Each structure stands twice: as structure tokens, then as C-alpha cells.
């Protein structure tokens, strides 16, 4: 008999993973600037490696931020507080190489092409996209968070791994770690069980592999994963190399923007390629991806589709998106053309419209930079609101 089961895998990483350190540092700097200058233009990139961090990018602002202080505070919060962890917030070197935003880019953002020859100074009309590009947003009704199950559980496990380190439950854990979850789907595309869980966690030198494996199951996996999803066939790989003492930036260099699939949908939906962290909301890589998630989530919550992927695309210096595309993968209750028309009517997808609609000039970005930008249960971001459901239902009647 033909077995129609399907497996799908996603991963997440802890806040102490080198690439995630870089994301959090970039977004901590962004927040520190936006706190005093909501209209700042920020493109902040971070590189971390043994004993040092390099902060580079383009920033135009009217405020002053003590960048080394922000970097050290962020590294301290993550947990790299002792030299023997391979990275120490107090003794690390911090290099900065910051320029202003290019005036060639600024003129297109400050005054969109459509309004350059007109006298409109209204910000929503005047602001152009900070770059060309394509962005995707996705939602599915397979979990209460409207996220695919594999990435949702991966984030929950990674967060739990960090929590038991920070609260002292497993005080031999160190900040670096990764999680991977493989979900089995039935022939109707419903998730039915967890096939495989992989956990790799940095640890102190004096703890045995057997203790780590036992403790991770007892304190991380079983309290996090619903018991009906685990059975005797579920496979667990916990620190499968046998040892993970050297970690963090000492083990691997980290870069801002190198975990874009972790940040979004775990590979379950398409990705336009642009990262989020370190970018102010005039950068549509970030703001339009948030808007696309907002649109997709409200469409699914309205019962208009079981799955929905939204693509937006922009031209640099132009306010209106050059295209809006919606794919419901055959689950739509109305046509995709109807959905596009409803979206055009009820969502302002110009850059300044998105910023206003989602209140994106707030200093909220550091908390997005670990454990996912979407479907979070510990914090409600503006793009996760379900306040367009009734409008969408009415629009397609």
C-alpha cells in the first residue's frame, strides 16, 4: 500500500548563536536610535568573531548613541559574561565603521517618483521605497499562531533551551544552541506527529553527554512539545557530535542577516532574500515583509483560505508596490484575484502607509531578532494583529 505521508523540517537557533548575536546587536542599535529619532535612516550590519565585534553600515540621525555601550549590554543580556565561554562582553574589542545614508538613495525615499513633480508633502504620498525587491508573507491555519508547525515548535524549543539556562535549571548550559524539528503530514496535509527532533547545545566541559541528553528531554523537549505529537517512533538527536564546548563567536563567526529562514517561515514559504535586522522601516525588505505577513494572516483568519502566501514588490524611490500577488495553494474560498482587490482596498502598502498602519517607528526591533519575527506567543507585534478580518470578509461577499 502506498504511503502518502510527507515530512517537512525547519530549524531555529538560540539567542547565543553567532548569527543571532549579530542580529540582536544590529537591532539593539536600531532601537537605541529610533527611541530618540523615529525618522532616522539606519542600515546597521554586525560581524562577531573571537574577542571582537565590528559594526558597519549607513546611519543618518539627529541623535547620539553610544554604540559600544549598546553592544556590550546586548552581549551581556545574551549571556556571554565570562571569558571561559569564549566571548566576554567586558573584554571584547568593538570596532565601528559607520557612514551616512547615500544622498542618492535618500532623495528617492524622501520624495517618491510619483510625487516628485507635484507639491504634495504628505508623508504617505511622498515616501518612496528604500530599495527595489520582492517580499513574501505567509500564514496557515495548522497552528493557533498561523505558523507552520515545524518552525513554531523549533522556536519554542530554542526559547525553552535558553530559558532553562538563564533560570539556572540547567546551569551547565552555555548560550549557543540550535534546534531542528521534522513534522510528518498525512495525505490531507495535516500534521500528525513529530518524526525527528535535533538539539545541539553548548555546554560546560565537565558534564557528560548522557546527562545532557536526559536533561534536554526532561526539561526542554517534553515540557514544550505536545505529548500527542510524540510517539515511540520519534527520533531524538541531542548533541549528536558528542561534544559542544567551544561555541558562540569563538566557534563560528556571526553575521547580521544570515538566518533569514529562521526569522520567517522555516522554509515553508518563499523568501525574497532580504534580511530584517538592523534596518529602519523605510527599508521595504523589513516593513513590506511584515505587511505581507499581516495581510496573509488576516486572510487566513477570515476563513478565506487555509494557507496564504502574499508577494509584494517595489521599485526604489517609488511609493506604490509594482506588484501584489496572492497564492492560496488551492485552499482559497474565493478567487485570488478577488483577494488581491480586497487587499488593495483595505491595506495601504506604500512604505509610509505600512509604517503608519503597523506603527513601525517604535523601538521594538531587538525583541524580534531572536525566536522569530512571526507567530510569537511571548509578545504581540503590530503585524500579528487580526483587525482586518471583518473588512476582508465584507470585501469578498
UniProtKB/Swiss-Prot annotation:
This is S-adenosylmethionine synthase. Keywords: ATP-binding, Cytoplasm, Magnesium, Metal-binding, Nucleotide-binding, One-carbon metabolism, Potassium, Transferase. L-methionine binds at residues 58, 101, 252, 283. PANTHER family: S-ADENOSYLMETHIONINE SYNTHETASE. Homotetramer; dimer of dimers. Its cofactor is Mg(2+); K(+). K(+) binds at residue 45. Pfam families: S-AdoMet_synt_C, S-AdoMet_synt_M, S-AdoMet_synt_N. GO terms for biological process: one-carbon metabolic process; S-adenosylmethionine biosynthetic process. PROSITE patterns: ADOMET_SYNTHASE_1, ADOMET_SYNTHASE_2. It comes from Staphylococcus aureus (strain NCTC 8325 / PS 47). Residues 101-111 are annotated as: Flexible loop. One of its GO terms (cellular component) is cytosol. GO terms for molecular function: ATP binding; magnesium ion binding; methionine adenosyltransferase activity. Mg(2+) binds at residue 19. Catalyzes the formation of S-adenosylmethionine (AdoMet) from methionine and ATP. The overall synthetic reaction is composed of two sequential steps, AdoMet formation and the subsequent tripolyphosphate hydrolysis which occurs prior to release of AdoMet from the enzyme. Gene3D superfamilies: 3.30.300.10. It is an enzyme of class 2 (transferase). Binds 2 divalent ions per subunit. Its EC number is 2.5.1.6. It is found in: Cytoplasm. It catalyses: L-methionine + ATP + H2O = S-adenosyl-L-methionine + phosphate + diphosphate. The gene is metK. The keyword ATP-binding applies.
Amino acid at each position: 500500500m502506498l504511503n502518502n505521508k510527507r515530512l517537512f523540517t525547519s530549524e531555529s537557533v538560540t539567542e547565543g548563536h553567532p548569527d543571532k548575536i549579530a542580529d540582536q546587536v544590529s537591532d539593539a542599535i536600531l532601537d537605541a536610535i529610533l527611541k530618540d529619532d523615529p525618522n532616522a535612516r539606519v542600515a546597521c550590519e554586525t560581524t562577531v568573531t573571537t574577542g571582537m565585534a565590528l559594526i558597519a553600515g549607513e546611519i543618518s540621525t539627529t541623535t547620539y548613541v553610544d554604540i559600544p555601550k549598546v553592544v556590550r549590554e546586548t552581549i551581556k543580556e545574551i549571556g556571554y559574561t565570562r571569558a571561559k565561554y569564549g566571548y566576554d562582553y567586558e573584554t571584547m574589542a568593538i570596532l565601528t565603521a559607520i557612514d551616512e545614508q547615500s544622498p542618492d538613495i535618500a532623495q528617492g525615499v524622501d520624495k517618491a517618483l510619483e510625487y516628485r513633480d507635484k507639491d504634495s508633502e504628505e508623508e504617505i504620498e511622498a515616501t518612496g521605497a528604500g530599495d527595489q525587491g520582492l517580499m513574501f508573507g505567509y500564514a496557515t491555519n495548522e497552528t493557533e499562531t498561523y505558523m507552520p508547525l515545524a518552525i513554531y515548535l523549533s522556536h519554542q524549543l530554542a526559547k525553552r533551551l535558553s530559558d532553562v539556562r538563564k533560570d539556572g535549571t540547567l546551569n551547565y548550559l552555555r548560550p549557543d544552541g540550535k534546534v531542528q524539528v521534522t513534522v510528518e503530514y498525512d495525505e490531507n496535509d495535516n500534521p500528525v506527529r513529530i518524526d525527528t527532533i535535533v538539539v545541539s547545545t553548548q555546554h560546560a566541559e565537565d558534564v557528560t553527554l548522557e546527562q545532557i541528553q536526559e536533561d534536554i528531554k526532561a526539561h526542554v523537549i517534553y515540557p514544550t512539545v505536545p505529548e500527542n505529537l510524540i510517539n515511540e517512533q520519534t527520533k531524538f538527536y541531542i548533541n549528536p557530535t558528542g561534544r559542544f564546548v567551544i561555541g558562540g563567536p569563538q566557534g563560528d563567526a556571526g553575521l547580521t542577516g544570515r538566518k533569514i529562514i529562521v526569522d520567517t517561515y522555516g522554509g515553508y514559504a518563499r523568501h525574497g532574500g532580504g534580511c530584517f535586522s538592523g534596518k529602519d522601516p523605510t527599508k521595504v525588505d523589513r516593513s513590506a515583509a511584515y505587511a505581507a505577513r499581516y495581510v496573509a494572516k488576516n486572510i487566513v483568519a477570515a476563513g478565506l483560505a487555509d494557507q496564504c502566501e502574499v508577494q509584494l514588490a517595489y521599485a526604489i524611490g517609488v511609493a506604490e508596490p509594482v506588484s501584489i500577488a496572492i497564492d492560496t495553494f488551492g485552499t482559497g474560498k474565493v478567487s485570488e484575484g478577488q483577494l488581491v482587490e480586497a487587499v488593495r482596498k483595505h491595506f495601504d502598502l506604500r512604505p509610509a502607509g505600512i509604517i503608519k498602519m503597523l506603527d513601525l517607528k517604535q523601538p521594538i526591533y531587538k525583541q524580534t531578532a531572536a525566536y522569530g519575527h512571526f507567530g510569537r506567543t511571548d509578545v504581540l507585534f503590530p503585524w500579528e494583529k487580526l483587525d482586518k478580518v471583518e473588512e476582508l470578509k465584507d470585501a469578498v461577499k
